[in-house]
Regions:
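C-terminal non-catalytic scaffold/interaction domains in large multidomain proteins
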Residues: 286-470
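Short, intrinsically disordered, charge-balanced linker/junction segments flanking boundaries
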Residues: 1, 257, 467-470
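Conserved Switch II/interswitch segment of TRAFAC-class P-loop GTPases
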Residues: 3-26, 31-55
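Beta-strand/loop-dominated core regions that host nucleotide or nucleotide-derived cofactor-binding catalytic loops
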Residues: 140-307, 400, 421-422, 429
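Conserved nucleotide-binding/hydrolysis micro-motifs of P-loop NTPases
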Residues: 15-20, 35, 44-49, 80-84, ...
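G-domain G4 guanine-recognition motif of GTPases
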Residues: 14-15, 39-55, 75-84, 176, ...
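Conserved catalytic-core segments of large NTP-driven translation/proteostasis enzymes
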Residues: 55, 63-211
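Residue-level signature of catalytic and energy-coupling elements of molecular machines
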Residues: 10, 30, 43, 61, ...
Length: 470
């Protein structure tokens, strides 16, 4: 727990031992967390007198990294006692440009707490590595999952007091009016109202290729999100177990609420004995629908984040969101969201974001609904917004967007506080005409006497709603 907040790996392998089982496990953890670049330090070279052995170990390591698609930045042979190769290793570390790993990060602040303590004269202090965004002394933050609010009293980074911090920084935060008991390892500190708590998530699960374990349906497992360990169970979609190297979108029901973001990566271990057996990516948080419904649909959720963005925008068309909301959901930079909008040719109108396909499908859906409404009830030619919202489940802003498009295309027109389809005619059946004639006759015969509308259903032998339409 905690490795998820890193971007590069320093893989240290002893020259006298070579590749060990833990080396393979650590490499699988790194690749599962999306850490695919790093530096190798071959240590204890002073203990190996046979230079050919060192060359063989180096060859094995390079082949292992290639096999796991791990990009090697530099290979360093070091001896800690004499200091040989240490300065070269330091130089290689310092030459890495962090900007390439942080360019697409959201401006919203988020950090996973890995340690918390109290310091005399200061109060509660927490430490961690900044996942996203930037924050300054004096700004307000939110503690999740409790959703308590607090203010940053002071910030330190690498032992020095600083005014602000950015994504990737290793920091200590001093919080005002917060008890150490309110925070623990795994707690998330973020921009207020950024994250939602949930115990139900959809994940892309990938089994380690070297594991001898299986993951069975409803199996209890250990999940490591950021610095948090939490227990939960997986629900598989169309099989009873996953074997080594297999992958699938699955449902996870956790035993406690967590605060995570889309595309967060994590590790899975067995409950007992504790063995690392899989990794994954969070595809969706707090999905709507029953488990039975989700099992039928989650396999279509894409793994690639930009494709998933398009999928969600299209899927959620009847309740669309704006760019700012999508930026918070995906915790990515506004520039990246704008790039996706351009790539997928999304429409930004009426303060919402949607696809051309969504627009076309909704126009067709509304047109069919109007035709069906006239067929079921030829007396009601003019419809109001509430009928559409209730019947189709659309949001008000989406109905307004589609109505404007239909008016532009002369498919509907506004009339008497509602709207109707252009060219719609009232096609009365023989029974409809008979009822109208009978009602007209009743009204004419009453002359100046009032008739209670509640009595008409009994006279005509029809329902009250039908009477209102007549």
């Amino acid at each position: 727990a905690g490795a998820a907040s890193t971007h590069l790996a320093l893989i240290v392998i002893a020259a006298d031992d070579g590749i060990m089982p833990q080396t393979l496990e650590h490499l699988e953890i790194l690749t599962s967390l999306g850490i695919t670049k790093g530096i190798v330090a071959l240590s204890k070279i002073d203990l190996v007198k046979d230079l050919e052995w060192i060359e063989l170990v180096e060859m094995d390591i390079r082949e292992l990294l290639i096999e796991n698609k791990f990009e090697l930045i530099s290979f360093n042979k070091v001896d800690s006692l004499s200091g040989k190769g240490i300065q070269s290793l330091k130089n290689n570390l310092m030459n890495i440009r962090p900007v390439e790993f942080l360019a697409n990060y959201s401006s919203n602040f988020r950090i996973n707490v890995d340690r918390v303590f109290s310091k005399i004269g200061f109060g509660t202090v927490l430490t961690g590595t900044v996942n996203n965004g930037r924050i300054e002394v004096g700004e307000n933050i939110e503690i999740s999952p409790t959703k308590e609010k607090a203010k940053i009293r002071g910030i330190q980074s690498h032992g020095k007091a600083v005014k602000h911090i950015n994504a990737g920084d290793r920091v200590a935060l001093n919080l005002k009016n917060v008890k150490t008991s309110d925070i623990k390892r795994g707690t998330v500190i973020s921009t207020p109202n950024l994250l939602k708590s949930s115990s139900l998530i959809i994940i892309y699960l990938k089994m380690n290729k070297n594991t001898s374990w299986k993951i069975k349906n409803k199996q209890r497992l250990r999940f490591y999100f950021g610095t948090l360990e939490v227990l939960g169970r997986v629900t598989l979609c169309d099989r009873m177990a996953l074997d080594a190297g297999e992958r699938e979108n699955v449902i996870v029901q956790l035993e406690t609420d967590i605060c995570v973001a889309l595309d967060d990566k994590f590790i899975i271990r067995t409950y007992s004995p504790m063995k690392t057996i899989a990794g994954g990516v969070i595809l969706e948080i707090n999905p709507e629908g029953t488990l039975k419904e989700l099992r039928k649909t989650i396999s279509s959720i894409p793994l690639i984040i930009e494709d998933r963005f398009y999928f969600f925008v299209n899927r959620d068309r009847i309740k669309p969101k704006n760019s700012h909301v999508w930026e918070k959901i995906f915790l990515n930079s506004s520039a990246l969201i704008e790039g996706w909008k351009t790539k997928f040719k999304l429409i930004s109108s009426n303060s919402i974001l949607y696809t051309k396909r969504s627009e076309e499908e909704s126009i067709k859906e509304m047109s069919l609904f109007l035709d069906d409404s006239y067929k079921k009830n030829p007396f009601r030619k003019i419809l109001n917004d509430d009928i559409i919202i209730t019947s189709l489940g659309w949001s008000e802003i989406w109905l307004d967007t589609i109505k404007k498009k239909l008016i532009q295309e002369n498919i509907i027109k506004i009339e008497d506080g509602g709207f109707l389809k252009v060219g719609a005619t009232l096609n009365f059946s023989k029974k409809d005409l008979e009822l109208l004639n009978r009602l007209e006759s009743i009204i004419e015969k009453s002359e100046l006497d009032q008739i209670s509308i509640k009595k008409i259903p009994g006279i005509l032998n029809i329902k009250q709603s039908r009477t209102n339409d007549l």
